[in-house]
UniProtKB/Swiss-Prot annotation:
Designated name of the protein: Platelet-activating factor acetylhydrolase
Organism of this sequence: Mus musculus
Tissue specificity: Plasma.
Protein modification: N-glycosylated.
Organism taxonomic ancestry: Eukaryota, Metazoa, Chordata, Craniata, Vertebrata
Enzyme category, top tier: hydrolase
PROSITE patterns: LIPASE_SER (PS00120)
Gene name of this polypeptide: Pla2g7
GO cellular component: high-density lipoprotein particle; low-density lipoprotein particle
Domain of life: Eukaryota
Length: 440
């Protein structure tokens, strides 16, 4: 028999590409014989195939392209997934999770057997997102740039709903894949020979013991900040005309990025551990003009950052992740004459900011807190619109994103101005405790 916990984790990782409820057999009657498993997997595929909803398209006027860029060799190389305004809307064929090792990494993160990762890659490794792979960049204007930092156990590809949404409104978004071993999986090439034959060196998530958690997480957030700055430097080098080599051998012509980025309009954005990375990197790199921290994990944030972070900062929190202690730490960033905003999305959970909220079925998504009470599309739409309004103000954009200025103030039926604890009628439950290894 398969334990109930394993079935639940299996459902989580299945990431059904359409929101479609279906019924699992009672665990006591579960048969693990290969012939029976084959028929059960067939039924799962059939259930998924009859659905209709997945990662949303951007709501802006620009077609969206996507590519991967890697500069240099070894584990200090720069690795980003780039979302950008495209010349034309080609096939929406960007693979969501492109290598089976990422599924293996997710199984490590969740503590399940590696065979689960293999099965999930077989079933869902071809799931695509609504962006055109290697489509030519739309030329003729300079774009603002957003560097994005992923959460613990995540990687560069699973924030496509945010990346695509922002790119469809005229941003270039570079999602960094971190090499601090906070990603479920990542890879690099040791040298040019390895890159030529695609001999990848894989790094998997580091399991951190409780007694070493504080020191390790603070080291990781510092490395993550350096990696965000390093990614920014590499992209700006290309913008200045430096002919860098993409060691991935992509068909995307990087020369298109020359003179395509307005380096006075650069922001930093991140989710959870990536939100903590936003706070760290802003304090160290003034090229980032402002930051958006999505439900930041405050555990690794050093107190010295409170007064060192000078740029405007927007916190967008979920309703059920933060503790009063976490909110108190965020409010210590409220310094005199410094722009600080905080809003909370009602009925949301921590995973409402990443793609898993869209690609998991309704029943499983709600049971495993991948979905909140709020519709996932409404939550991500509020996130993107509030972010764009904030970015327009502080990057000096000549757009119409100011129509969403009320969202930055929490003026919407689905928003709370300030923290979850500022709503008299809402008492949020805690998903995790500070310092937990399941934080994201």
């Amino acid at each position: 028999m398969v334990p109930l916990k394993l079935q639940a984790l299996f459902c989580l990782l299945c990431c059904l590409p359409w929101v479609h409820p279906f019924h699992w057999q009672d665990t006591s009657s579960f048969d693990f014989r290969p012939s029976v498993m084959f028929h059960k997997l067939q039924s799962v595929m059939s259930a998924a195939g009859s659905g209709h909803s997945k990662i949303p398209k951007g709501n802006g006027s620009y077609p969206v392209g996507c590519t991967d860029l890697m500069f240099g060799y070894g584990n200090e190389s720069v690795f980003v997934r780039l979302y950008y305004p495209a010349q034309d809307q080609g096939r929406l064929d960007t693979v969501w999770i492109p290598n089976k090792e990422y599924f293996l990494g997710l199984s490590i993160f969740l503590g399940t057997p590696s065979i689960v990762g293999n099965i999930l890659h077989l079933l869902y490794g071809s799931l695509t997102t609504p962006a055109s792979w290697n489509s030519p960049l739309r030329t003729g204007e300079k774009y603002p740039l957003i560097v994005f930092s992923h959460g613990l156990g995540a990687f560069r590809t699973i924030y496509s709903a945010i990346g695509i949404g922002l790119a469809s409104n005229g941003f270039i978004v570079a999602t960094v894949e971190h090499r601090d071993r906070s990603a479920s999986a990542t890879y690099f090439f040791e040298d040019q020979v390895a890159a030529k034959v695609e001999n990848r060196s894989w790094l998997y998530l580091r399991k951190v013991k409780q007694e070493e958690s504080e020191s390790v997480r603070k080291e990781q957030v510092q490395q993550r900040a350096i990696e965000c700055s390093r990614a920014l430097s590499a992209i700006l080098d290309i913008e200045h005309g430096d002919p860098k080599e993409n060691v991935l051998g992509s068909a995307f012509d990087m020369k298109q990025l020359k003179d395509a980025i307005d380096e006075t309009k650069i922001a930093l954005m991140g989710h959870s551990f990536g939100g903590a990375t936003v706070l760290q990197a802003l304090s160290e790199d003034q090229r980032f003009r402002c930051g958006v921290a999505l439900d930041p994990w405050m555990y690794p944030v050093n107190e010295e950052l409170y007064s060192r972070t000078l740029q405007p900062l927007l916190f967008i929190n979920s309703a059920k992740f933060q503790t009063p202690k976490d909110i108190a730490k965020m409010k210590k960033f409220y310094q005199p004459d410094k722009e600080r905003k905080m809003i909370t999305i009602k009925g949301s959970v921590h995973q409402n900011f990443d793609d898993f909220t869209f690609v998991t079925g309704k029943i499983i998504g709600n049971k495993l807190t991948l979905k909140g009470e709020i519709d996932s599309r409404v939550a991500i739409d509020l996130t993107n619109k509030a972010s764009m309004a904030f970015l327009q103000k502080h990057l000096g954009l000549q757009k119409d994103f100011d129509q969403w200025d009320p969202l930055v103030e929490g003026d919407d039926e689905n928003l709370i101005p300030g923290s979850p604890f500022d709503a008299v009628t809402q008492v949020p439950a805690q998903q995790h405790s500070p310092g937990s290894q399941t934080q994201n």
